[in-house]
Amino acid sequence: MKKLFFISFFLIASCSKSGDLVMSKNAKDIIGNNNYPAISYGGYRGKSREVQPSIVDIKEDLKIMFAQGFRVIRTYDLHHPFAENTLKAISELKNSDSDFEMYVMLGAWIQCKDAFTDVPIHNEEDLEGNKVEIAEAVRLAQDYQDIVKVIAVGNEAMVHWATSYHLEPKYILKWVKYLQDLKINGTINNNIWITSSDNFASWGGGSEEYHNDDLDELIRSVDYVSMHTYAFHDTYYNPVFWNLSGDLEDLSKKDIIKKAIQKAVEYELSQFNSVQEYIHGIDSS
């Protein structure tokens, strides 16, 4: 059965550069494992990505996340030094502390032609930029085999509300298949899982405008589906979601919050279930 995992934004054996001993955990051991909580990680201190956090800054963050129990982090792009510096920081922490454990879901940013301009071309890809992102993902997956366990092709690159950069599923599919071929020929570790990080609608759980043969083939081609759902952020479009019904007015503040959280969980599970239903109609294996 095709594995499906969701990221909720309601809350928020070889040698490599990172050491001589490759950790035994693979993607199949950590993804979906409650003992390996994951969190998306940016690490930026300023208002612009042009101001990059130092490796010292990143180490500070990693120690905090490790102390909180997180064991997997997700990054977003590779056209800034941040992702590689994060891998360097993890490697250095591992080498200085044998108890430190952290894995990475490495995001490769994929976008359409003329993204972030006044006239993005959504039916074409930014070929040169996307090639650089994928090449960097491959290089880092080779250099940090003990840390990089997942490569995610695109971050919310297919959902239509990403008006500045979204593109058609066929381009995500192309790069997913390319990476799967590299696993087969031994260029990258065969145990790395390949996916795409995207909104529930993009994975078939929304309207029929997203349903097409390329999406269906993408579902068959990824190692698992990484689905995003965000009860909090979605209320930008649906602010009445958090309005109190009359039967809650007499409850304590704690009970009101508890019911609001439960409502959000149910909201996210409904999106998960809609994607799961679509996926099982495509690939029941």
Regions inferred by a protein language model and the residue ranges of each:
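Acidic-and-aromatic substrate-binding clefts and catalytic sites of carbohydrate-active enzymes
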Residues: 51-52, 74-85, 112-115, 127-130, ...
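Substrate-binding cleft of extracellular glycoside hydrolase catalytic domains
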Residues: 23, 78, 84-192
